[in-house]
């Protein structure tokens, strides 16, 4: 949006992160045959980060312009094109471009980039040739350079994604890049345009499937980076009371009573770690269209079935001409609850189940199903459940349970249970478990006179 002396720019962008030969394959076999070349120009960046654009074609009106770009928003999110198995990590940027007189520019350049812009509807496909890129970061090794770049981004509230990580482009090297951009003026992007953009991305990345790109990734580090969503509150279900407050319910599902776990879907591979430190891994066909890492939450039911209950994050592969392919461990894309639920329901309808053949015995993997309100109570379940999981209209998770539970630590010496505040004395202990172990955590229901022990929580170390 042009305001005269400055322009407010809103855009959704995506970078195609592949090696140079694959980028040229995408250009020659997909972009050039299917889309028209709309613009060509040079972008010159001086040592202060000011950009000067020199057009080559008349489509740009042959006006040389210089701007100072200041970022005001940089949001990573995951978009799900409806009725597909694609989770697309995108970046939403908003910036202010202030027009500059040429006298304010420096003669010392830091970047020289030639850009070819191919147009489809409102989507721009940019194929770039980086002829020159110089940065003080190039003086450091790759690890230190990445840390400095991240720190600078935090200090300036800017965007370091344009910085080539330790690229050191030489005089005989021209670095190719492909980016997709969709600019919009409204408060939010148009879903139709996002669907078009995601279809183009899927088509491009499908051309590289035969390469079977699957770099080594730090699995335990990625699992530790995952943050399951928290329940904002817990609500007791009263027996015989069918009057749920459905006005505040957006989606609901059965609360499965299993062992919680976290896992990663990768190309041809899946790994799961449960809260009691059990690992499940198997080779399997890629369930998602794009070659990224999808982090999920699950419930393991009696070591026979695993239900995917939530999709949490997407980790995207990066590429540079020094360290080649690597996973952006510290740059994940969060999946919002609504997107996760819609994708899980689609996978529930279309994937049904997958057998994890590398486990012993074989385990069936399924996607849980979420429902629209109203909540419905059922007297018969084929799996063990202990209530409902509700996503309310404010996109907060709420736990509905028939019996609110507490995690207590057993004291075998005094034959009592302890909370963080001390022992619970004078209550009768009821349990069907063969034995209660000293200083172990158990999930219990507390009444006025009894402590009913439900199950042993090997995944807990302190009472709750």
From Swiss-Prot:
KW Hydrolase (keyword) present: yes
InterPro entries recorded: LEF-4
GO biological process, alphabetically ordered: DNA-templated viral transcription; regulation of DNA-templated transcription
Region forming the signal peptide: none
Catalyzed reactions per annotation: a 5'-end diphospho-ribonucleoside in mRNA + GTP + H(+) = a 5'-end (5'-triphosphoguanosine)-ribonucleoside in mRNA + diphosphate; a 5'-end triphospho-ribonucleoside in mRNA + H2O = a 5'-end diphospho-ribonucleoside in mRNA + phosphate + H(+)
Enzyme Commission (EC) number: 2.7.7.50, 3.6.1.74
Principal subcellular localization: host cell
Active-site residues, record numbering mapped to chain: 255
Keywords tagged on the record: GTP-binding, Host cytoplasm, Host nucleus, Hydrolase, mRNA capping, mRNA processing, Nucleotide-binding, Nucleotidyltransferase, Transferase
Record flagged with keyword GTP-binding: yes
Alphabetized GO MF terms: mRNA 5'-triphosphate monophosphatase activity; mRNA guanylyltransferase activity
UniProt cross-references to Pfam families, sorted A to Z: LEF-4
Record localization: Host cytoplasm; Host nucleus
Complexes and interactors: Interacts with LEF-8, LEF-9, and p47.
Something else known: Tpase and GTAse regions, and GTase active site inferred by structural homology with vaccinia virus TPase/GTase family.
Similarity comment: Belongs to the baculoviridae LEF-4 family.
Task of the protein: Component of the viral DNA-dependent RNA polymerase that catalyzes two reactions involved in viral RNA cap formation: an RNA 5'-triphosphatase that hydrolyzes the gamma phosphate of triphosphate-terminated RNA and a guanylyltransferase that reacts with GTP to form a covalent protein-guanylate adduct. Therefore plays an essential role in late and very late gene expression.
Name of the protein described by the UniProt record: mRNA capping enzyme LEF-4
Organism whose genome encodes this protein: Autographa californica nuclear polyhedrosis virus (AcMNPV)
């Amino acid at each position: 949006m042009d305001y005269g002396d400055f322009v407010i720019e809103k855009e959704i962008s995506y970078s195609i992160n592949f090696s140079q030969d694959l980028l040229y394959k995408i250009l020659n076999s997909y972009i050039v045959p299917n889309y028209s070349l709309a613009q060509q120009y040079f972008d010159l960046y001086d040592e202060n980060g000011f950009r000067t654009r020199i057009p080559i074609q008349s489509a740009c009106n042959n006006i040389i312009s210089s701007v100072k770009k200041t970022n005001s928003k940089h949001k990573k999110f995951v978009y799900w094109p409806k009725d597909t198995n694609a989770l697309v990590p995108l970046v939403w940027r908003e910036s202010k471009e202030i027009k500059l007189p040429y006298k304010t520019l420096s003669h010392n350049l830091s970047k020289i980039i030639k850009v070819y812009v191919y147009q489809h509807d409102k989507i721009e496909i940019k194929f770039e040739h980086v002829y020159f890129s110089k940065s003080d970061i190039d003086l450091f090794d790759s690890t230190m350079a990445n840390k400095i770049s991240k720190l600078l981004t935090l200090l300036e509230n800017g965007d370091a994604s344009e910085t080539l990580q330790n690229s050191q482009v030489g005089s005989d090297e021209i670095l190719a890049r492909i980016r997709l951009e969709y600019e919009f003026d409204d408060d939010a992007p148009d879903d139709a345009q996002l669907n078009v953009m995601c279809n183009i991305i899927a088509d491009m990345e499908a051309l590289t499937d035969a390469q079977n790109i699957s770099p080594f990734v730090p699995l335990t580090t990625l699992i530790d980076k995952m943050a399951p969503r928290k329940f904002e509150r817990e609500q007791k279900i009263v027996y015989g009371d069918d009057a749920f407050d459905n006005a505040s319910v957006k989606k609901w599902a059965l609360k499965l009573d299993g062992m919680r776990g976290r896992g990663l879907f990768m190309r041809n591979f899946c790994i799961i770690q449960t809260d009691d430190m059990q690992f499940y891994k198997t080779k399997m066909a890629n369930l998602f269209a794009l070659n990224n890492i999808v982090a999920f939450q699950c419930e393991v039911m009696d070591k026979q079935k695993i239900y995917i209950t939530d999709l949490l994050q997407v980790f995207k592969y990066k590429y540079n001409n020094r360290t080649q392919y690597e996973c952006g461990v510290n740059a994940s894309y969060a999946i919002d609850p609504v997107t996760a639920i819609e994708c899980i329901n689609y996978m529930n309808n279309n994937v049904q189940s997958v057998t994890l053949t590398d486990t012993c015995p074989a385990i069936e993997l399924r996607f849980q199903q979420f429902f629209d309100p109203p909540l419905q109570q059922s007297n018969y379940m084929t799996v063990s459940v202990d209530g409902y999981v509700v996503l309310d209209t404010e996109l907060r998770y709420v736990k509905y349970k028939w019996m609110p539970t507490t995690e207590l630590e057993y004291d075998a010496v005094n034959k009592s249970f302890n909370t963080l505040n001390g022992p619970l004395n004078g209550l009768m202990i009821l349990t069907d478990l063969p034995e209660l172990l000293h200083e172990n955590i158990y999930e219990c229901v507390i009444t006025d006179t009894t402590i009913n022990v439900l199950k042993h929580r090997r995944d807990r170390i302190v009472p709750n």
